[in-house]
Amino acid sequence: MADEPGPGKAFARWRLPQGLPSGPFAAYLLVIGLTAACAGLVYFLVDRPPPLIEEAVAAAPAVSQTKPVNSLKLPFRRPRPLEFRMLTLAERDDMVEVTPDGLRLPKISFDGWMPWIAYARRYDPSGPAARVGLLMINVGADEALMMRVIDELPGEVSLAFLPGTPDLSRWMKRAHAHNHETYLMMPVEDPEGIGERGIRAISPKVDGAENVKRLQETMTRGEGYVGFVMPTPGPVSQSEEIARPIVKEIADRGLGLIEINPGPTPTAMYRLATELGVGYARTSTVLDYKLARNGLDGNLDRLAEWTGETWPGRPARHDFGVLQPDDDAIDAIVAWRQRLAHQSAVSLVPIIGHFECRSVCMERLHRQPDQLRP
């Protein structure tokens, strides 16, 4: 009996075996152990990798195969070309001649690139064959108007700047950023004696070498332009003796030439441009002529209607008009462009789309075949 446990001894408190740690250290071990056990349980229940796709497919019931659905192919869309050619800095510099005085003149590059092609605005040749164009001339006399012209007119409208415009290079860069093709107005002596401040005009009263020097001074006023705009017919454009050194300088530097000539007779400048291989365009359409019966809005609509007229066997027409910058003209062009977007008979293209390039001109282009690409 003495060896039998007394009451309560069978339920004596269990004690850790001798040699195991006790106290705070044991508590830390217990917490660490519980944490590891919980982490393992969570990994097993939550983060276990999903069954393989092959297993899921094998376990799924077989389904009957269906015929593939044949969708209609989308029509091919030609990627829209960049408005201007992407020229590297080296290519641009190669089209610039730096004079001993530090002036920068345009020139034909070593590879044969001519500025009148390199700086022309691109357009989609797959559009309607009938083409219209707009050239706003004498831009720069009024800064507020010039800003509206550049910022608000459609990019297809080409701009001809007065060479005496202050900070002209900056304004021409801004025009390019808004997708406008740019030109310089040729400074020709006005019979009424009105001229631009700081610009020496080309004159029938001086010799050819002096006129070339004055033309070069004008060329240095900006960069990235296609060529020159001859504003009105007169002694400079009508006399071959006066015009030849001027057109030759334009040809030698790879620039283009535009004439505004309402008369039916070709000028000496046109004949020389053909002979010397200059890219050339001419118009007799002055849209803001004050005595026009239908006003500017009517003249714009008439230009598009006449160009879009067609009948079998007749080639597509093209024409461009010129006008001066003013607020009414800007508003009229913006509204006209919106009307033009709702028809498909004519396309609005920059003035380069109205240039002609005859045999000698084409021979010069072939020296750099990339110039023939649209």
Question: Which stretches of residues belong to each language-model region?
Answer:
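Active-site beta->alpha N-cap acidic-glycine motif
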Residues: 113-196
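Hydrophobic faces of well-ordered beta-strands that scaffold small-molecule active sites
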Residues: 132-136, 157-161, 182-186, 226-230, ...
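Alpha-helical scaffold elements lining the catalytic groove of polysaccharide deacetylases
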Residues: 198-220, 237-242, 271-312
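C-terminal domain-boundary segment and adjacent tail
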Residues: 250-265, 269, 325-374
